[in-house]
Amino acid sequence: KMIADATDLPMIVFQYSNEVAYPLDTLVQICEDVPNVKAIKDWSPPQVHERHIKTLHALSRPINVLSTNSAWLMSSLVMGADGLLSGAGSVIADLQSELYQAVQAKDLPKAQELADRIYHTTQVFYCDPFGDMHNRMKEALVLLGRQDGPAVVRPPLMKLTQVEIARIAEAMTAAGIAKEGAIGLDSPALAAE
């Protein structure tokens, strides 16, 4: 509330897994009492995520639910998530955007094809140790030539091994990701970039 009182900027509440997330009653109260809150970034497990979508959409001032569940993004969008905020978007935003559009158009075959491509990336980005996820995305950006190398790793994390970097390269190939973006997308807006 103190932050909202200091600005009229829109705000997003981050629901970071069950252990540290706001209980649903508290989340609803925040959304009702703080008009700046326009959305939540939701990293909750499926059952809780769906409850958030249904509850927050039913408020007198509906709140957008933005998924950060990259590993099961298609399911999240089908549940009714309004969009996404994902670290993986630094590498695969075009695939994520196309998946969102396919789900909105109820084009299940296309959505499944895109989710299959995304799967290759999430398997290498979000594997153990989980804390290295952003370092893996940085390495992907370097491998794709989108960012100058070497990828910067902040302590206490350590640089990824060459074996892991090779797995990331294989995943980018399997997902059809190139320097310019995902290969073979139909979206005119993305093709023009």
Predicted regions and their residues:
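Active-site beta->alpha loop and helix N-cap motifs at the rims of alpha/beta catalytic domains
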Residues: K1-A21, M158, A178, A182, ...
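Short, functionally important structural connectors and interaction interfaces within domains
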Residues: F14, Q29, G149-V152
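Proteins with a high burden of low-complexity, intrinsically disordered sequence enriched in S/T/G/P/A and R
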Residues: K1, H49-E50, M137, S187
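Catalytic alpha/beta core domains of metabolic enzymes, predominantly
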Residues: M2-L9, S17-F130
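Structured C-terminal cap/extension of enzyme domains
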Residues: M74-E193
